[in-house]
């Protein structure tokens, strides 16, 4: 089941299902990247990040969480979240078993939240965390902040969020990632809501440049197409 439009290889290996973008030559790092509650691994934002990052030497696996593998539509159920985190771990292991270099993990919205919880439970899981539109709290309910696990994160974390995201303001998110016990960086996308995929936001390119600095990745002189 090739994804010829984006030159990615379909992957179905145990609990891992998705698409793998490989750079020319040996990867200098890898990223396991997953989707939000309403989508799957074909989401435009994930494809854009995978395309841009792989063009600079970073292998990217965009993968479906367990709840999406179980059914094509519908939101995840809170009781099934541990299974989604298991999928995150399996995706990281898949990449680690296939090449040298640091393995990063992350996701958009719910996917980023599950990735963050997975690394809070195991600081050796990945070398860095990417949070795209972290859902800090339900819209209009800042008192229900999802921050309890953040102090247990001990790896560098890059957070990217829009100024119009109802799930958390830039000020709230900066304060939240300040709880993380490692280096952090925050990218504020002016005018963006929860969806960061619009071309004008250049999310893939901006996150890449911040990531190579924060995570110490040597991408050499390759260029982003």
Regions picked out by a protein language model, each given a short descriptive name:
Residues 46, 143-146, 155, 169-177:
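Short alpha-helix in the alpha/beta-hydrolase fold that links the catalytic acid
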Residues 179-195:
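Catalytic histidine neighborhood in serine/cysteine hydrolases
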Residues 192, 200-225:
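Catalytic active-site module of serine/aspartate enzymes centered on a nucleophile-bearing elbow/loop
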Residues 153-154, 159-161, 165:
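Short beta-strand/loop motif that positions the catalytic acidic residue
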Residues 163-168, 195:
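Acidic catalytic loop of the alpha/beta-hydrolase fold
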Residues 88-155:
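Primarily recognizes the serine-hydrolase "nucleophile elbow" in alpha/beta-hydrolase
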Residues 9-102, 197-198, 203:
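Serine-hydrolase catalytic machinery in alpha/beta-hydrolase-like enzymes
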């Amino acid at each position: 089941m090739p994804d010829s439009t984006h030159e990615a290889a379909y992957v179905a290996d145990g609990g891992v299902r998705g698409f793998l973008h490989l750079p020319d030559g040996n990867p200098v790092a890898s990223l396991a990247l997953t989707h939000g509650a309403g989508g799957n691994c074909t989401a435009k934002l994930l494809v854009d990040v995978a395309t841009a990052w792989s063009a600079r030497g970073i292998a990217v696996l965009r993968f479906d969480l367990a709840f999406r593998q179980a059914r094509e539509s519908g939101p995840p159920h809170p009781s099934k979240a541990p299974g989604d985190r298991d999928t995150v771990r399996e995706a990281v292991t898949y990449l680690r078993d296939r090449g040298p270099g640091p393995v990063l993990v992350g996701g958009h919205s719910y996917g980023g939240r599950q990735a963050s919880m997975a690394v809070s439970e195991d600081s050796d899981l990945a070398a860095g965390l990417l949070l795209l539109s972290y859902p800090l709290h339900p819209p209009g309910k800042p008192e229900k902040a999802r921050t309890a696990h953040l102090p247990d994160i001990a790896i560098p974390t890059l957070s990217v969020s829009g100024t119009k995201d109802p799930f958390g303001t830039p000020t709230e998110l900066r304060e939240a990632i300040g709880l993380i016990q490692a280096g952090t960086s925050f990218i504020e996308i002016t005018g963006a809501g929860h969806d960061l995929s619009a071309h004008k936001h250049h999310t893939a390119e901006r996150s890449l440049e911040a990531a190579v600095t924060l995570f110490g990745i040597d991408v050499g002189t390759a260029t982003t197409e």
